[in-house]
Amino acid sequence: MLRHAPRIHLNTVVLGELIGGFAAGTREAANRQSLSKFLDSPRVSLLDLTVDTADAYAQVWLGLRRKGQPIPSNDLWIAATALEHGAALLTLDSHFRQVDGLRVVERLADLLP
C-alpha cells in the first residue's frame, strides 16, 4: 500500500509499535533491517511528539471523552500528530473516524490527485 505513496509521515509512537511488534515476533532482526531501510528513504519522515502534539492530544482525548467514545492512548497520539500537521491518516482502524476534524482514508488512492 505504501509503495506508491509519494510522501510518508509517521510518528515515534507508530515507530515504537512497529519495534515492539518486531520484538514479539520471530524475525526481529530482519524486520528491523527492513524498517531501517524504509526510514532512510527520502520519502519518509519521522515526526517527533511536541508540546503542540500534547495540546492536540488533550483536545482529542477530551472530545472523545465527552462523546463517550474512547480510543487507545497510542491512537490518541497518532491522531494528534496528524491533526497537528494537517495530514490525512491512512488506516484501517475505524475508531479514528470518531476524532473530530481528522481526515481518515482507507486507501492510498484516496490521497493521490
Locate each region found by the language model.
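PIN-domain endoribonuclease scaffold, especially VapC-family toxins
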Residues: 1-84, 98, 102, 106-110
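Nucleic acid-binding interface residues in structured DNA/RNA-binding domains
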Residues: 90
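Short glycine/serine/threonine/alanine-rich loop segments
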Residues: 87
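Conserved catalytic-core motifs of GNAT/GCN5-like acyltransferases
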Residues: 94
